[in-house]
């Protein structure tokens, strides 16, 4: 009887391993295909947009989704430089993860345990989060974020990652993407954004629901000045240089 129980447990463990392995394979194949499709097809809606719409419905403050997709060549080079300066100085150099920035952020957070935490998410990581995942702060979500970051860096070009980032990122209540933001705040298309306007929009990205580029607080105004000072020194993507 005892031997039969042990044998039965081993059989169950074997079946569980097979099921788990099968699920992992299906998950990889499915997500690989989705990321590959988005290399060529622009997403209509993202998980974050769905969450924001649901939040608006339940709070009776529905603002809808304001979004207009624009190819990277119809977005001002100033905006590309502004987000690289603001969010990810080594965007063109890393493979999705800026280990130097991660170490620096970890050291800073250790020294300022009671202050505001500094993040080190790259533009690639933010794109993975914005396009594929629902917003949360769990380690599980971080794990999926790293996984999708690996996939988009593997399958997409840096140009496509930047294009997706600038078209899907949240830039205000109900505002997604740089074209909608440019029209909302400055009443101009994204391709006509000046350095100052681009830096002002980039400065609100850490807290787009609480900040406004037209009414910057002291911290945001300081950030705008810092971004402007960095824009001329960041490495310019080749697609920007070709478009000039």
Swiss-Prot record:
Gene Ontology cellular component list: peptidoglycan-based cell wall; plasma membrane
Group of enzyme by EC: transferase
Stretch forming the signal peptide: none
Residues spanning the membrane: 18-38
Membrane topology, as annotated: Single-pass membrane protein
InterPro entries according to UniProt: Glyco_trans_51, Lysozyme-like_dom_sf, PBP_transglycosylase, Pep_trsgly
Entry function: Peptidoglycan polymerase that catalyzes glycan chain elongation from lipid-linked precursors.
Name used for this protein in its record: Biosynthetic peptidoglycan transglycosylase
């Amino acid at each position: 009887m005892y031997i039969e129980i042990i044998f039965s447990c081993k059989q169950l463990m074997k079946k569980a391993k097979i099921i788990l392995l099968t699920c992992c394979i299906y998950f990889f194949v499915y997500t690989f295909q989705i990321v590959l499709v988005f290399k060529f097809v622009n997403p209509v809606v993202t998980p974050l947009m769905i969450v924001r719409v649901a939040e608006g419905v339940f709070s009776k403050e529905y603002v809808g989704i304001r979004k207009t997709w624009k190819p990277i060549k119809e977005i001002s080079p100033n905006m590309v430089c502004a987000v690289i300066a603001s969010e990810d100085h080594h965007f063109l150099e890393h493979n999705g993860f800026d280990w130097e920035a991660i170490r620096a952020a970890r050291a800073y957070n250790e020294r300022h345990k009671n202050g505001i935490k500094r993040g080190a998410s790259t533009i690639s990581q933010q794109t993975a989060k914005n396009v594929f995942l629902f917003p949360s702060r769990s380690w599980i979500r971080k794990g999926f974020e790293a996984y999708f970051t690996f996939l988009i860096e593997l399958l997409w070009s840096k140009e496509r990652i930047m294009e997706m980032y600038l078209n899907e990122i949240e830039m205000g209540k109900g505002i997604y993407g740089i074209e909608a933001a440019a029209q909302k705040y400055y009443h101009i298309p994204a391709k006509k954004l000046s350095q100052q306007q681009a830096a002002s929009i980039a400065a609100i990205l850490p807290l787009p629901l609480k900040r406004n580029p037209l009414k910057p607080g002291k911290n945001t105004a300081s950030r705008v000045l810092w971004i402007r000072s960095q824009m001329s020194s960041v490495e310019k993507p080749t697609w920007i240089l070709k478009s000039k």
